[in-house]
Curated annotation (Swiss-Prot):
The keyword Acyltransferase does not apply. Residues 229-412 form the FAD-binding PCMH-type domain. Homodimer. Interacts with BTN1A1. It comes from Felis catus (Cat). Keywords: 2Fe-2S, Cytoplasm, Disulfide bond, FAD, Flavoprotein, Iron, Iron-sulfur, Metal-binding, Molybdenum, NAD, Oxidoreductase, Peroxisome, Secreted. One of its GO terms (molecular function) is 2 iron, 2 sulfur cluster binding. Disulfide bonds join 534-991. It comes from the Eukaryota. This is Xanthine dehydrogenase/oxidase. It catalyses: xanthine + NAD(+) + H2O = urate + NADH + H(+); hypoxanthine + NAD(+) + H2O = xanthine + NADH + H(+); xanthine + O2 + H2O = urate + H2O2. [2Fe-2S] cluster 2 binds at residues 113, 116, 148, 150. Binds 1 Mo-molybdopterin (Mo-MPT) cofactor per subunit. Binds 2 [2Fe-2S] clusters per subunit. Belongs to the xanthine dehydrogenase family. PANTHER family: XANTHINE DEHYDROGENASE.
Amino acid sequence: MTADELVFFVNGKKVVEKNADPETTLLAYLRRKLGLSGTKLGCGEGGCGACTVMLSKYDRFQNKIVHFSANACLAPICSLHHVAVTTVEGIGSTKSRLHPVQERIAKSHGSQCGFCTPGIVMSMYTLLRNQPEPTIEEIEDAFQGNLCRCTGYRPILQGFRTFARDGGCCGGSGNDLNCCMNQKTDHKITLSPSLFNPEEFTPLDPTQEPIFPPELLRLKDTPQKQLRFEGERVTWIQASTLQELLDLKAQDPEAKLVVGNTEIGIEMKFKNMLFPKMVCPAWIPEPVEHGPEGISFGASCPLSLVEKTLLDAVANLPAHQTEVFKGVLEQLRWFAGKQVKSVASIGGNIITASPISDLNPVFMASGAKLTIVSTGTRRTVRMDHTFFPAYRKTLLAPEEILLSIEIPYSREGEYFSAFKQASRREDDIAKVTSGMRVLFNPGTAQVKELALCYGGMHDRTVSALQTTRKQISNFWNEELLQNVCAGLAEELSLAPDAPGGMVEFRRTLTLSFFFKFYLTVLQKLGIQNSKDKCGKLDPTHASATLLFQKDPPANVQLFQEVPKGQCEEDMVGRPLPHLAAAMQASGEAVYCDDIPRYENELSLRLVTSTRAHAKIKSIDTSEAQKVPGFVCFISADDVPGSNITGIGNDEMVFAKDKVTCIGHIIGAVVTDTREHAQRAAQAVRITYEDLPAIITIEDAIAKDSFYEPELKIEKGNLTKGFSEADNIVSGELYIGGQEHFYLETHCTIAVPKGEAGEMELFVSTQNTTKTQSFVANMLGVPANRILVRVKRMGGGFGGKETRSTVVSTAVPLAAYKTGRPVRCMLDRDEDMLITGGRHPFLARYKVGFMKTGRVVALKVEHYSNAGNTLDLSQSIMERALFHMDNCYNIPNIRGTGRICKTNLPSNTAFRGFGGPQGMLIAEHWMSEVAVTCGLPAEEVRRKNMYKEGDLTHFNQKLEGFTLPRCWEECLASSQYHARKREADKFNEENCWKKRGLSIIPTKFGISFTVPFLNQAGALVHVYTDGSVLLTHGGTEMGQGLHTKMVQVASRALKIPTSKIYISETSTNTVPNTSPTAASVSTDINGQAVYEACQTILKRLEPFKKKNPSGSWEDWVTAAYLDAVSLSATGFYKTPNIGYSFETNSGNPFHYFSYGVACSEVEIDCLTGDHKNLRTDIVMDVGSSLNPAIDIGQVEGAFVQGLGLFTLEELHYSPEGSLHTRGPSTYKIPAFGSIPSEFRVSLLRDCPNKKAIYASKAVGEPPLFLAASIFFAIKDAICAARAGNPDCKTKKLFQLNSPATPEKIRNACVDQFTRLCVTGTAESCKPWSVRV
């Protein structure tokens, strides 16, 4: 049968595709067929929003043009017939005019690495197309489906709030009495100049937006016909009528129905499922009908329309009729981002039959009715406990389809609630969901009907029938509560090895949810003055019934203005926007995978181990060779040079004979396209002989599996210190690992040049020189034949310092073997599986202290999980030991470090580099000292704090010790003591919600601890027109390094920044570079740039003297005509660096950065949920080179630390397989995760004489300040435990990091947790283990 032509529009241009493949996504088509690379691939599963576009179509059923955001990575092109697509390139450009959305995110400093920026721009643009004057709440809701790993979200929201009708930010101008900077503080604030000026923004003019394609509008009355698209493996049929759909299902009952592709797309990509025939019913009318018993929705109705319809119903119907609707709306509020809700259908959510569905428990509890049809039959069934007979199964026969669902009106005396608990509120998969309904006999509190339905408690949605049936005719009181809780605890049990783990937490949630429902109904009954044997609501319990509400935003950014008289062209100290921000916002900025494909380019896909430790018995590529476009398979046998690689020469480019982790690279397939490469890699068959594996730190300790050497720092007399101590506390702390989650995954393009072994590499790496060295070693050629080029990265955070070479060595080998350009960009799941992350740590400590709280002795044994190679683990452990004191002077101290060798992918550098782990351990035992002494934690911390001139435990003298200033300023500006009293009062008045405060300092050493890395070079070219091309050894990954280097050169040369340009970092301009890491890149590269500029200035000096009134261009031209070189190099090495572990002497650091943060949180003791109310930060960055960039780094680091300490959790199976391989299972902070009040102040008048222009490093030091959130949570848990008779140990308790909802809930011991204690059966393997 002949395939139809696919017709759609992209940015106003008509696209006719004669060979539409149903497996091709819109993202792939945009990037590879149309060359529109602004839309990014971040995850491939609709979880990050980097691929967001706007889709527009004429909706025949609503009789209007509709605009909605969508994930291009999930949208099949076949679903876009007669749809208009708008990408970031279609709304504005630096070459013409930026759209106001693009301009505002750029000028408000909302783009750092920029990889997420186009998607965020398109989410905001879509909102404005639908609502030109949105509310602040609508703006925040628009970004539920978008992630950013760099900015900390504040500048994005603050910039876009200028569009809001109810809260445009004045930018801190001080002209608005209601300014967020003037709210909720009595502390005197010296207003800074604003980071941006909203008055400079181009106004939004909705009349100037592109029109909907007239050709598509003319088709609105044309009858639709069935369409058929044929791909390599899949046929797509677009049904135009219900009868067509029924006939198609009758002909092929196994044909898969697809609407939004939000579930099927995931199954095809990540579960390797194939559906040869896909039928799309999206054109079939999806009527919304208001009937006598409820509102009926067609099964294809998008969830966004369901949400809008129910919101209208709640606003217009009597309150007693809308109880169920409110429950559905509460679930939809957190269901997913706009991109998913706009395309996902209500019927698809039901038929998917997910055991953790947000909506199915609600529909089941409400008694929703489903209309099911097939050819010649039609039936209506109630969605009850029988509808899901097994895992992912429904009662529908293969030939049947779901036609509609009717959500009922609630009745008088009927109450309904819906609940969900996940790791993160926005766009997260639930741990447990629930729908609960009760109907009372008229005028009484006697139960007539009770439905308690749950997701996440079985392999399907379940109804607690045994429990609920026993409550009929009982009264709504304390006795019923106890009976239901006891019944649920027995009926909804989970095996210790249940998939998803968190068994006690999930079981407890079933009771907690019912208790919330009980209180909510009790409250409503009380309002109605029903006293018929009804329980009474304790006022301290009332807050447990409140739904989550985020407080209005209040953000402050304070910094020191440049001195009066500073030249206007001197941009040092000014909040200059990131130089590439506008290009990033318009999609014009080029990242590695954005480079256009070469004519004969090939694609590579890695083949990795599925065993943690095993011998390789055989590799069979025969099936892979059958995949269309297959070229070759490469392995260790193809390496012409050395297969040995890695920082410690303990790795292999490709595993040979044996694998040592799941994800170990065995080989790679090379094909003509990315899709074919993926299929071919999956077809490679490897057989193994398993060997014993070591997965966890505890395993490694038990089996003495360590890398050498054991590290130790010791000072004072530990024996004497402990003997003199009044108290001694011992314990341990576990700190989980963290995934980098840079939005741009690892990417390499290798281009063989055809001469003398030359190879040109485009790589997303922080380490150009090591990449060059490793590739040269692998190919067996000198380093001078390998050119490595880096334009920019979409984030790095340490993850691209060494681990980028796992891709950048495989790709050039394929290019060498084939003689053709080869490209590889890892999928998100590959990247997370292969490249490692932050090291998990286990610390065992013993601390001795006096009754006054003064610590006199400390012993800490540190263990890190390094994985299967050493990589940078030794340096990371060294830094952990250097930071084991944090900010405290401990006279007698010993720290040891053991690096565990395990069968996990090698862990590596991550922002902070071991420092955060060392400091969190310090603050943990410090908090236990305070609790034991019965003293305020802030008093104990201050009492033990270093003073100016003190020596650290590694004998480095503290000079320029600004920490006390930071501490006092933070105490004052945060109103710590007053707010602590307010929190105590809140806790007295609320039983199930508790607040906590904490103030935490940080001291972070600045330098590579490997001395020779503290060097940098720069190259400056001055052209005859006066323009300057600047190159240095650092790479740009969003931290603003290139921007700061231009500012440094601008001041040094005394010319405007507009005359200076940085193109890229490359090994043929600046050789032998150090990695862009350790927060020192501005220090060392800035000084090298300065030195190069000074050389240029000295050469120009004679011409300036001859022509003092001349211009820069005049002097440059004169020098050129006099044959004076206008090119200069600069070089810098940090002086007086070097430390000996043997003698505990020398200086590992050039200087220290300091900061203090105070945070307040509120926890829900029943669910473990928490919200970050407020954070105040005071940070010493010296004399800031760029306050906007520095504040952005402070906020971004803090929010990344917030993820580390409260949210991000890696789950491994006992066999060493990573469960969390994407944004659906691994949660980083989202827009709603940040503190409602976020106040950052850069310490004034604190120049640093040891760095360029008196500045200080800023990238890593602020991250640890997020520990203030962790300890604020712990403070709130203490308040919960103190008031609960079920808790035996009130204040000393174990809280490992991260403080997830599971850990928070389990720590808030109460009558519900007591009912849900689950033993561990020896025969059961847990779903996940703590590595």
